[in-house]
Structures are given as structure tokens and as C-alpha cells.
């Protein structure tokens, strides 16, 4: 089975690790790559509630139940991180907030994949014909409920996060289009006085070369055409 752990890696705050179980008569040895609080919590809870472990399958089922509870616990923390990133994105869209969402999405992918594997393990144990009569039916129901709830919660959060990232991607794309429109509009408006000055500066008769008001007329025409350009672009909502 795979169990959830909180990681010290900032880029991957939550991940899942395999938990191996070796049974030898009445002894069970757990093997894990990382130290996890799930096992110690499981032992303390079992002793505190005076829970009697019937057999090896009963132990595996209770570990599946405990891991599902921890999945739900970490999913609540992931949901808080999603809300925090959403609040930060509402204030300003920066790469840090988007990267935080990508990291959370990666954690959810690990959770969903691991929960599917645990669900397969649960149903294989549940469908063992030789052990059906010995299973605690209440325990089977509890494991089924908690495991299904953890899977549904992880899928819901993943769908919400995917929709949120798609929405922010659309917002960023729309903002880029608006900026490009504004830059294009400004460039066109700035070209108007430049074009008029270039035409006036040509060495050809234009009727204003002898007038002492020629430069002022050109300035006035440039201002009027520029204002008209601004008005036209505003009507088209390019500003």
C-alpha cells in the first residue's frame, strides 16, 4: 500500500511512499523509505482503544483505514493551500502563485494514483473467498467509506484546481491581448505626427513652406488627428 507523508521539499509539500509489510507468525515488520507518523499514530490509537487485531488481513485493513484518514487530513491542508494561492492570485498574478498551484496539482496526482492502488488492494482482500467469513464487516464498511471519500475528495480538488488554472490561463492570455492592443494603438497614434512632419519636411512644394504659420498649422493638424485616433481606438475599446 501507499501512505501519504508531509515532505520538507518546498516544491512538493505532500507525497506518497510505499509501505511494505512482512508477516512472520505473530510478528509484523513495516518497511518504509521515510519516517512517518502514520505508523506511530496507528499503534498509539490501537493501544488507546484496546483494539484487538484478529489476523494479518485485519491489520492490513486497519492500516488502509488509518491511511485513508490521513489522506483526508492532508487533503484538507492542500485545500487550504489552494485557497491561499487563489487569494494571492486575486491580488496579483505572479509566477510564484502559479508555480504553487502546479506543485499542489502534482501532489493531488500522487494522491489520486496512490488511492486507486490502495482501493485495488482493498477489493482484492475483500474478495478473498477463503477469508470472507472471518472479516469484520463493520471494518470493511468503514474502510470502503473512508477510502471512497478520500478518492472523491482528491478528485474534486483536482478538478477544481484544473478549472482554476484554466481560468487564470485565460485571464493571462486576455491581459496579454489587451496589452498588445494598447501598444499597437499607441504606436499608430505616435506615427501620425511623425508622418505629417515627414511629409512637411520633403523638398517639394506643399503650400505651407512660405507661411509663417505653417509649423503651427502642422502641429494643430497633428494634434487633431491624434485626438481623433485616440477617440476612434477608445470606441473600439483598444484603450
What are these regions (language model features)?
Residues 1-134, 139-142, 146-153, 208, ...:
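Peripheral, non-transmembrane regulatory/ligand-interaction domains of membrane transport proteins
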Residues 148-239:
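Hydrophobic alpha-helical transmembrane segments and their immediately adjacent juxtamembrane loops
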Amino acid at each position: 500500500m501507499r501512505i501519504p507523508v508531509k515532505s520538507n521539499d518546498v516544491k512538493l509539500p505532500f507525497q506518497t511512499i510505499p509501505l511494505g509489510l512482512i508477516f512472520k507468525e505473530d510478528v509484523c515488520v513495516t518497511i518504509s523509505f521515510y519516517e512517518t507518523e502514520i505508523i506511530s499514530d496507528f499503534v498509539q490509537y490501537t493501544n488507546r482503544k484496546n483494539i484487538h487485531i484478529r489476523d494479518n488481513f485485519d491489520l492490513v485493513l486497519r492500516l488502509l483505514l488509518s491511511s485513508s484518514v490521513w489522506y483526508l487530513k492532508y487533503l484538507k491542508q492542500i485545500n487550504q493551500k489552494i485557497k491561499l494561492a487563489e487569494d494571492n492570485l486575486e491580488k496579483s498574478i505572479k509566477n510564484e502563485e502559479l508555480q504553487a498551484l502546479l506543485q499542489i496539482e502534482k501532489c493531488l496526482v500522487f494522491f489520486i494514483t496512490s488511492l486507486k492502488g490502495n482501493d485495488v488492494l482493498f477489493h482484492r482482500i475483500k474478495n478473498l473467498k477463503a477469508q470472507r467469513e472471518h472479516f469484520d464487516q463493520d471494518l470493511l464498511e468503514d474502510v470502503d467509506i473512508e477510502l471512497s471519500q478520500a478518492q472523491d475528495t482528491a478528485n474534486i480538488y483536482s478538478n477544481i484546481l484544473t478549472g482554476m488554472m484554466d481560468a487564470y490561463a485565460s485571464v493571462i492570455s486576455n491581459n496579454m491581448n489587451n496589452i498588445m492592443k494598447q501598444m499597437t494603438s499607441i504606436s499608430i497614434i505616435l506615427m501620425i505626427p511623425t508622418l505629417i512632419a515627414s511629409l512637411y519636411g520633403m523638398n517639394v512644394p506643399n503650400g505651407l513652406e512660405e507661411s509663417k504659420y505653417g509649423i503651427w498649422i502642422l502641429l494643430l493638424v497633428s494634434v487633431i488627428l491624434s485626438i481623433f485616433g485616440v477617440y476612434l481606438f477608445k470606441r473600439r475599446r483598444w484603450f
